[in-house]
Design a protein with these regions (language model features):
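Short, well-structured alpha-helical segments in soluble
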Residues: 61-67
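Active-site histidine-acidic residue metal-binding/catalytic motifs
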Residues: 1-61, 154
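Conserved beta-strand termini and adjacent loop/short-helix elements that scaffold enzyme active sites
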Residues: 51-53, 93, 125
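A short, glycine/acidic-enriched catalytic loop
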Residues: 11-25, 79-110, 114
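Active-site-adjacent mobile loop/cap segments within catalytic or ligand-binding domains
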Residues: 3-5, 9, 14, 67, ...
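Catalytic cores of processing enzymes, dominated by hydrolases/peptidases
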Residues: 60, 96-149
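Polar, enzyme-active/binding microenvironments
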Residues: 40-43, 72, 76, 88, ...
Length: 157
C-alpha cells in the first residue's frame, strides 16, 4: 500500500503553513502537489491512503496501518535565506535500510531531473534541521521529499 501525505497541510488546532516564499505557502503547495500525485495514482488504479486536509500529522500516523510492504511518502518544499538555494532532497530515517535508501535516491534523482534543478541527494533525518521526524518511525519504505526551494522562483517555475 502507498501512503501519501502533504507536509504542513494547514489544518488542525495549530496551523503551520510551513515555509513561505514567492507568494506561496508550503502548506498550499504540498496539498496541490499531493492531489496531482493522487490523480495519477487513481488513473493507474494504484491503491493508496492519503492524509485528510483536516487532520494533523499525528492523527494521520495514528490512523494509518503501515506494514513491511508499505511505501510511506510525504511531500515538502525547502526554503533558505539565500534566494539562489536550489534543488530536491530526499530524507530517510536514521535507521533506513537499503530499500529506503534506493527508493529515496530514485525519487530525488527523478524529481531533480524532471524539474531541471540540482539534485541535493539523500540525507538522513539526523542531518535535517529537525534531527528526528515522526514520519520515519513508520514501517515499510519511508521517505520525505523536499521537492524544491519555495524561496527560489526558478525552482518553482
Amino acid at each position: 500500500m502507498i501512503f501519501i501525505s502533504a507536509g504542513h497541510n494547514n489544518k488542525g488546532i495549530k496551523t503551520d503553513s510551513g515555509a513561505v516564499g514567492n507568494g506561496h505557502t508550503e502548506a498550499n503547495l504540498t496539498v496541490e502537489f499531493r492531489n496531482l500525485v493522487i490523480a495519477q495514482l487513481k488513473a493507474k488504479r494504484v491503491p493508496y491512503v492519503s492524509d485528510n486536509d483536516d487532520e494533523r500529522l499525528a492523527e494521520y500516523l495514528e490512523r494509518i496501518k503501515t506494514g513491511n510492504a508499505s511505501v510511506v511518502l510525504e511531500f515538502h518544499f525547502d526554503a533558505s535565506d539565500k534566494p539562489t538555494a536550489t534543488g530536491a532532497t530526499s530524507l530517510i530515517g536514521s535507521d533506513a535500510d537499503r530499500l529506503d535508501k534506493a527508493f529515496a535516491k530514485e525519487l530525488v534523482d527523478a524529481t531533480a531531473f524532471r524539474l531541471g534543478i540540482r539534485n541535493r541527494g539523500v540525507i538522513s533525518e539526523a542531518q535535517s534541521h529537525r534531527g528526528r521526524l515522526a514520519l520515519m518511525r513508520e514501517n515499510g519504505i519511508v521517505c520525505l521529499l523536499e521537492l524544491c526551494f519555495i524561496s527560489n522562483i526558478r525552482d518553482l517555475t
